[in-house]
């Protein structure tokens, strides 16, 4: 199945894959290497703060990785890094997807810790995190947090209310030194055709 999907993506002109939101099967990484795909290898979907598991609620009991983060995050991340670091297609390590800590004072301390593990084990690759709150309301990602990330990942810039049509322009002007990547974005239209995956 993976081979067929990756070959379809290649036919569409895609040259990179984001693994989300946990370490992928090594067989997928082997295929990406074989077929010439760049890869963003991602470790976590939650840190200490749980995500809402149901619409409109963040008060229910967590059944996610946040329950195990303190006990397992260092071992889990280091295991992924040591296992995957020799895959030539990997171009970025991702330490998280839409992590609630991005809006919390002190959240950057965890970002520094996790990035540190990545840089210690593999100093050749940059570290990213997929942010979905960069210009969100009422709380947005803190610059103190994003400043600790090598490559700031932008998720769904088109949904940020008054900035919805500005996309990356405002940040490009305000943060000239910020390296960014679109980590999760819908197509602006179905230009190339529809593909059946």
Task: Label the predicted regions.
Residues 1:
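Active-site-adjacent "gating/activation" loops or surface patches in catalytic cores
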Residues 5-9, 16-197:
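Substrate-binding/catalytic cleft of secreted carbohydrate-active enzymes
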